[in-house]
């Protein structure tokens, strides 16, 4: 089995050149699968939906440690550029720089004789986590003792991540000619009133995870400016610091009979392993980890800042990519050698 010294900058840029907005991960998945196969890994491409495939690669038949992250990005595609210090463009920190760092770390471990390793790269993390949900049923998951999931954490160890609750709020009215608004009922005016109360709501929080926060991400409604709007809809994204039950109950109390709330998707907050010697923090975002319950004990670590992800100026520092490789190798060795004790 060939072992390579991976140039993490070059690999990051090669991955970024391949557009992979959620729903279109086919080409980047094929590239990664072929690349890992050329290194001698046993590669499986797991069909998820519409030709979109997870990539699973193992260095032996006893993969106790997996590195994992996602291949999809948010829109729009932004081609890569670089200077001496940074790599810019879509996926630089979320999460193609992480893919490159994890592959480079796996190769360093193999070069040192460690073969109890695997790699899992999923589709659809930025949407509904269809990839991780499908991966959770793979038989190889039973062999995994530890999974290091990669997201931009500033190379700090994430010891907790908030949950994610997506909801749809709908209001109904009665259409009428806009010259006679008293003959109708405006669903948009009703929506504005309800959202004002929802945005100002005091939602249940948690001492460990912090506050539960709410974002109104989308609003739509109405037919034309000369028609009293009969319907309106808003998309809510709540970052959960608690179980979803108390939050949904509180929101239903606020909305009352003025509208309808529907849960679109939900993943709960997760506490993860604490490891001595690493900078540690709780992150506000969610990951694939809640869907990968069969993949051993989860850890969260990756280069780049979540504040730069999903932006027009997305970038990752080259020094952070190099540091991430070293951190992944160090953490992987300690986990495989039994040098990490569970704190939570």
Spans of model-derived segments:
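Acidic/His- and Gly-rich active-site-bordering loop/insert found
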Residues: 1-91, 114, 300
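Alpha-helical metal-binding/catalytic segments enriched in His/Glu/Asp
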Residues: 67, 84-129, 167-171, 181-201, ...
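Acidic-glycine-rich active-site phosphate/pyrophosphate-binding loop
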Residues: 71-83, 143-144, 159-170
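Residue-level marker for buried hydrophobic side chains located in beta-strands
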Residues: 65-67, 148, 174
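Metal-dependent amide/peptide-bond hydrolase catalytic core
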Residues: 3, 20, 27, 152, ...
């Amino acid at each position: 089995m060939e072992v390579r010294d991976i140039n993490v900058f070059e690999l990051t840029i090669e991955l970024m050149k391949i557009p992979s907005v959620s729903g279109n991960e086919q080409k980047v998945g094929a590239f990664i699968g072929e690349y890992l196969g050329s290194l001698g890994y046993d590669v499986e491409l797991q069909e998820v939906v519409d030709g979109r495939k997870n990539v699973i690669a193992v260095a032996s038949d006893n993969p106790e440690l997996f590195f994992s992250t996602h291949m999809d990005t948010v829109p729009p595609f932004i081609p890569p550029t670089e200077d001496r210090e940074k790599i810019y463009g879509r996926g630089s920190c979320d999460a193609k720089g992480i893919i490159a760092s994890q592959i480079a770390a796996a190769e360093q471990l193999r070069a040192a004789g460690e073969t109890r390793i695997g790699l899992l790269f999923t589709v659809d993390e930025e949407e509904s986590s269809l990839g991780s949900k499908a991966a959770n049923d793979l038989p190889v998951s039973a062999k995994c003792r530890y999974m290091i999931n990669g997201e931009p954490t500033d190379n700090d160890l994430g010891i907790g991540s908030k949950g994610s609750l997506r909801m749809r709020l709908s209001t109904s009215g009665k259409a009428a000619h806009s010259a006679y608004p008293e003959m109708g009922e405006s669903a948009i005016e009703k929506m504005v009133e309800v959202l004002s109360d929802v945005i100002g709501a005091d939602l249940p929080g948690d001492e460990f995870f912090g506050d539960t926060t709410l974002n109104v991400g989308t609003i739509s409604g109405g037919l034309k400016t000369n028609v009293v709007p009969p319907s309106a809809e808003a998309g809510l994204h709540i970052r959960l610091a608690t179980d979803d039950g108390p939050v949904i109950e509180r929101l239903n109390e606020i909305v009352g009979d003025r509208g309808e709330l529907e849960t679109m998707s939900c993943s709960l907050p997760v506490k993860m392993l604490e490891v001595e010697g690493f900078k540690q923090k709780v992150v506000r975002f969610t990951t694939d980890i809640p869907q990968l319950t069969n993949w051993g004990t989860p850890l969260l670590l990756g280069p780049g800042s979540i504040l730069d992800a999903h932006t027009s100026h997305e970038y990752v520092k080259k020094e952070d990519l190099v540091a991430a490789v070293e951190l992944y190798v160090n953490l992987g060795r300690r986990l495989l050698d039994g040098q990490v004790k569970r704190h939570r």
